[in-house]
A protein has these predicted regions:
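Conserved short "hinge" loops at termini or chain/domain junctions
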Residues: 1-51, 61-65, 81-91
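Contiguous, low-complexity intrinsically disordered segments that are highly enriched
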Residues: 67-77
């Protein structure tokens, strides 16, 4: 659920206050949108929840720091998720 993703995201970003919750929830929604533009249909699974969390954390860090590139781990996870989905549809 989005609440679970928010909890994990806050832990990842070392945010303990609820002051940023609305902003972080917006990043979670944006991450889902960006992932869907990659051609991925998200499921209600733990692995897809972690994919959304990783993407939301990347969006947060990108806004806070200069020259933040998409982490290779995230790009790898997106590619693997897309290929597994397309393989299941076409296979």
């Amino acid at each position: 659920t989005d609440a679970d993703i928010l909890t994990i995201l806050k832990t990842d970003l070392m945010v303990s206050s609820s002051a940023l919750d609305t902003y972080l929830q917006t990043l979670i929604a944006s991450a889902k949108d960006y992932i869907s533009t990659e051609g991925i249909t998200l499921a209600d699974s733990q692995s897809d929840g972690m994919l959304v969390e990783m993407y939301a954390a990347y969006l947060y860090r990108r806004r806070r720091e200069e020259n933040v590139q998409m982490p290779r781990m995230l790009r790898w996870a997106l590619n693997n998720r897309l290929f597994s989905e397309k393989g299941a549809v076409n296979g």
